[in-house]
Amino acid sequence: MMAPLLKLGFNGIIDAVDLDPVGHRLFAQHCPGWADSVRFTKADAVDWLAGQPRDFDLLIDDLSVPRDDDVFKPDISWTVLPSLIRQRLRPEGTAIFNLLPEKTGAWPEQLQPMTRLFPSSQTVHLSDFLNRIWIAGNALPRPATLGFRLRHSLQRLESRQAQRIRIHSGPPRPKRT
């Protein structure tokens, strides 16, 4: 995540929270020049966020748990964490959720109550992936504006995804049958 952020001009500190420090150790080992930009805490994400003395401009839920040869979103990502993220965002803040459908391709029923927490939201579809990036907050740019900005940023990064994204207002839509 750091390489694209730095290439796009980000120069802040990122707080990363995980119960398993292996990913951060690998990051620090292979990207030592960027390690100072990440403040890692080994903790439960809910406990950590609830205990923070400040609110945030941006919060990202990328929580997933390995199972067999796959990964899934634990229940806490659909229930407790979204409302806590909503509470800890500044009024102009943005929440980004990396959502994964169930094995059937359907979205969990917990998605509906989660989406009611935010007055404005958009979903980013990356054609090469099953997950959806759900962006939420009090006010967001129109999907066309967000799509233009996102494509432009991806082009600056020379990412093939620049031409493979679609954006629509609202939460992820049910799988078409």
Predicted regions and their residues:
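Generic alpha-helical propensity signal that fires on short helical segments
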Residues: P32, F56-L58, S77, P113, ...
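Residues that form generic nucleotide/phosphate-binding pockets
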Residues: W48, L117, R149, S153
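Low-complexity, flexible helical/coil segments
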Residues: F27-H30, L49-R54, E92-L100, N131-I135, ...
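C-terminal substrate-binding/active-site "lid" region of AdoMet-derived donor-dependent transferases
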Residues: D69-D75, T79-P143
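The AdoMet/dcAdoMet-binding core of the Class I SAM-like
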Residues: M1-R88, T104, F129
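A generic structural signal for alpha->beta connector loops
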Residues: N11-I13, A35-S37, E92, F118-S120, ...
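SAM/dcSAM-binding transferase cores
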Residues: Q112, D128-T177
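Residue-identity detector for glutamine
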Residues: Q29, Q52, Q87, Q110-Q112, ...
